[in-house]
Amino acid sequence: MDLIEEAIKLESDLIRINSVNPSFGGKGEKEKAEYVKKKLMEYVESYNIENYTLKEYNIIDKYGIERPNIVFKIDFGRDKTLHIISHLDTVPEGDISLWGTNPYEPVIKDGKIYGRGSEDNHKGIVSSLLLLKMIFENNIEPKYNLSLIFVSDEEDGSEYGLKYLLNNFEDEIFKKDDLIIVPDFGTPTGEFVEIGEKGILWIKFNIKGKQCHGSTPENGLNADIVAFNFANELYNGLYEKFDEINSIFLPEYSTFEPTILKNKVENPNTIPGYVEVVFDCRILPTYKIEEVLEFINKFIKNFEFKKYIKHYDNSIKAEITYEILKSENPNYTDENAEIIKELKKAIKNVLNRDAKLCGMGGGTVAAFLRYKGYNVAVWGIGEETAHQPNEHIKIEDLVKMAEVFYEILK
């Protein structure tokens, strides 16, 4: 089976295995991890691979679900190891009506394969497995040891994934001079290498008014109206205040986007008395997360809800509080690190493109490694359809990614 055929087989099998993160109502990664283990052992037997270890670092999560983490290492007798870290979990399919195909049944069209997880993060899993095939079919002597790591829980903070590994088994798995790639990013042409990530702040605002009948707004306080206007004014205020530009990042500005707005009312004739609004903030390293929170605190204190609402119970005041759902500082990799130099050379040799260093707003597991002093490159090739309906990836790009990894090793 050639590389394209193998890529199609692997990607198709993975798409058929639903591994939605349990935090989003899914059953988790166990079945997908079992498939990956099976494929690894098939390669071990087919190519008579020696000096390998395959270890599982599993943990039971708060839902009682087993969350798998796999570390497959081959010792080629080198001082340094190349680690490639992919994640097993996916986000849900979202609004199924927006899909042109079944999200969990692979469909191939115009050289692309469609399905949930096809890009995020099957491209990492598939290219890692293809790399093994390339190494042993070409009988090379790699200049680094190889470590393929497949983790859980990337889509919801990595408490049961890479964070768990680093907190409990760091010295067993990693050395500070190792080379690490996280294939969880990518542009269609593959020249961008992510070396930094914005700070992340997820913040939920709890907006309390007073529930009443829809025909008598003067007896309550419409939390919807307060929430709509609060979110709109805060949105504009944050973008105006924190407006610095840094061209290395994609996008080059901080972002402050309201993503969730919900109340507890299901019938049309009740005015809601409580609304939740969630903002997803991605903050350039120019600013500290504390500065953003300070601005938000002042904004809440000065927000005048009365000018936005015509009829309400004058004895009631809107209450706005918040809780931080997630807060992570920005992180960087030294652009002169060995992994960056090696990856840039490989991109040039395989893709015939000059690598460009960039930062991004999305968070990856690279952050947790960088916080501990490791140099990590986040790289891949993709159609930029992660988390979207009709997620897909070019089949040839799965092979190209493996070829770039191979170029680093040979």
From Swiss-Prot:
It comes from Methanocaldococcus jannaschii (strain ATCC 43067 / DSM 2661 / JAL-1 / JCM 10045 / NBRC 100440) (Methanococcus jannaschii). Binds 2 Zn(2+) or Co(2+) ions per subunit. Pfam families: M20_dimer, Peptidase_M20. It comes from the Archaea. Zn(2+) 1 binds at residues 87, 120, 184. This is Uncharacterized metallohydrolase MJ0457. The active site is at 89, 154 (proton acceptor). One of its GO terms (biological process) is ornithine biosynthetic process. Keywords: Cobalt, Hydrolase, Metal-binding, Zinc. The keyword DNA damage does not apply. Gene3D superfamilies: 3.30.70.360, Zn peptidases (3.40.630.10). Zn(2+) 2 binds at residues 120, 155, 387. Belongs to the peptidase M20A family. The keyword Metal-binding applies. Its cofactor is Zn(2+); Co(2+). One of its GO terms (molecular function) is acetylornithine deacetylase activity. Its EC number is 3.-.-.-. NCBIfam families: DapE-ArgE (TIGR01910), PRK13983.1 (NF010589).
